[in-house]
Amino acid sequence: FSFEFILSVTGILLILGLVFASSQLDKTGQHIWVQTIFLVLIRLYIFLFSVMSKLGTLGIILDNGWEAPSRSVIKTRGSRKMKGLFVLTLLFLLAQSGMAVFDLATLEVNDQIKLVAHRGYVAKGVENSLEALEAAAKEKASYVEMDILLTKDNQFVVMHDYNLKRLAGIDKKVQDMNFDEVVGLPIKQGEFTSRIPSFEEFVQRAKELDMKLLVELKPHGKEPDNYAELFINEMRRLGVATEYKTMSLDLSIMEEIESKAPEIQTGYVIPLQFGNFSLSNVDFFVIEDFSFNDSLVIQAQSEGKEVFVWTINDPDLISKYLYKSIAAIISDRPDIIEREKQYEEKDNSYFDKLYRLIYN
């Protein structure tokens, strides 16, 4: 324990000294050779720390009763081992140098990432309301994610919950009410008030704001057999089939829409993903932070699909995902994402680089 503690403290001091020296030599943080040496030395320390820790553990085991090799055996084998160790160290440094150049060249903010405001900008209005839509547009979100339910008379309204009690104070389900009974009902969330809009009304306002929508279908189980066709027809009637994206927890509905209306971009929302993605006829996957790993992005891209991540609100997590090859970040805080993006593009000190390399 004391050995690793001393090694850790020494390493921290060395890393801080390296960061300081690199910052003095390259104040802009853009000199490729200084960056390469910086990264190689950091990785070399991590490698040596791992080796020394294992050697320390081995030493404790030997002290507790293992019989060490004789002095003559050690002497005859020593020179060959030292040569081999030298060659391996040299190869390691060369490999790390190449990897460092590659990492530094690719460790850039992904400027293609779409910012998706989750149910609008909910810090400025009731979720899924026109006010939340308008607030998200002011924050220059790429898309607004919103939820739609089918009423008893087979029309679409904008609402997340199956039951209206949480927002409207009415203990009734949307599936048991007609369109005219739902649209216009007052809703309240925190200090904000609004009313339930129809899907068409929401789309028309989004068009006025030049805001694209990510439409989540929320099937409640009592939809007619032609549910997918009802949605497709509505998207086409409103003239947004090729502009908007849609997603759902129900894979079968998404695959039906993909089959019947390939012009509509479809996504499968996966609450918890273990292992690789299963074979799915959709255009993108939507996963939460816990399930995310880089191999999933590689798999999706190899299949010509995209990956969206939800719901990312923590600034550190937002910063992390800005460097990933994902298509979109879904967040309740579009204001934070834009701020973090500007910060990451601007700040390139060696402390920033060290943090990104460790955290990403």
Model-derived regions: residue spans:
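Structural preference for beta-strand elements that scaffold enzyme active sites
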Residues: 112-116, 143, 212-214, 243-246, ...
